[in-house]
């Protein structure tokens, strides 16, 4: 009986990890679409995963920011960066998705 409980626990954890990796991959793909498209982030920022070589904003491969900090800047703008949330360019879900992407350095 203990073996069955162990196997069941293992399978639950294994399946959960697979589901999370698919969710992460889907979120990353959606983030890339926003980064290179609607958000126009690639025009100003460097991000290897997006194939972007912008030279106006910071290189996102080199900044060390929290998710909340990135989300705040994308929403409200900073310096020459426009407020993509306040001007209606991106909705809340799109801001969270592109903010997540900007933290992934692959």
Question: Which functions belong to the PLM regions below?
Answer:
Residues 1-8:
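Bacterial N-terminal signal peptides that target proteins for export
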Residues 17-36, 69:
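Electrostatic cytochrome c docking/interface patches
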Residues 31, 38-47, 98:
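The canonical Cys-X-X-Cys-His
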Residues 42-75, 80, 86:
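Gly/Gly-Pro-rich "capping" loops immediately C-terminal to redox-active cysteine motifs
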């Amino acid at each position: 009986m203990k073996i069955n409980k162990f196997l069941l626990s293992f399978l639950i954890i294994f399946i959960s990890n697979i589901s999370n990796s698919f969710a992460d991959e889907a979120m990353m793909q959606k983030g890339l679409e926003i980064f290179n498209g609607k958000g126009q982030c690639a025009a100003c920022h460097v991000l290897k995963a997006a194939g972007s070589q912008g030279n106006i904003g910071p290189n996102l491969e080199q900044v060390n920011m929290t998710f909340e900090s990135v989300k705040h800047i994308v929403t409200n703008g900073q310096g020459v960066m426009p407020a993509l949330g306040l001007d209606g360019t991106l909705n809340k879900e799109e801001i969270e998705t592109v903010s997540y992407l900007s933290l992934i350095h692959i």
